UniProtKB/Swiss-Prot annotation:
This is Neurotoxin-2. Its main location: secreted. Residues 1-24 form the LCN-type CS-alpha/beta domain. One of its GO terms (cellular component) is extracellular region.
């Protein structure tokens, strides 16, 4: 949602615009 996809590998959200992964 809002240009964000849920990464099932990390369970975090990845921004398609900047390809950023959350490290929480």
């Amino acid at each position: 949602e809002d240009g964000y996809l849920l990464n099932r590998d990390t369970g975090c959200k990845v921004s398609c615009g900047t390809c950023r992964y959350c490290n929480d």
